[in-house]
Amino acid sequence: MVCLEIIRPILLQCKFLGHIRSRLSLPCNCSYQYDVDPVTQSFTNRRVFAYSDSGIPDGIQLDTNGNVYSGCGEGTHVWNPEGTLIGKFFLNSTTAEMIFTKSGLLILDEERIYLADIQAQGIDLAAY
């Protein structure tokens, strides 16, 4: 089993000789992937899954083909199971959340709700 984690940049202020240095942003705008130990359920083998080229990934959904959906700076990005970007829903705003429905993918941005008529289906978490 594999677990995905989206990490937001952490802003740090460092004091050096009484002066506040510029903020450092750690880590990158990326999603991490882990292996999950089937016995202990602990996460191991952390590695970068995918990078966002616009904004910070926020929210995560998976479809039945293993594709990963995440809200980013310009809309929703879609990566295949290997972490290659395969599509974007351009909304010209930051996506806050995505939800698979029987009618498609419901996308919520900062002010509006969109329904994308797509063939992909969300995974059934009750099966896990």
Where on the chain are the PLM-derived regions?
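Short loop/turn segments immediately following the C-termini of beta-strands
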Residues: 16, 24-27, 36, 73, ...
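Short loop/turn segments immediately following beta-strands, especially the blade-tip
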Residues: 34-41, 117-125
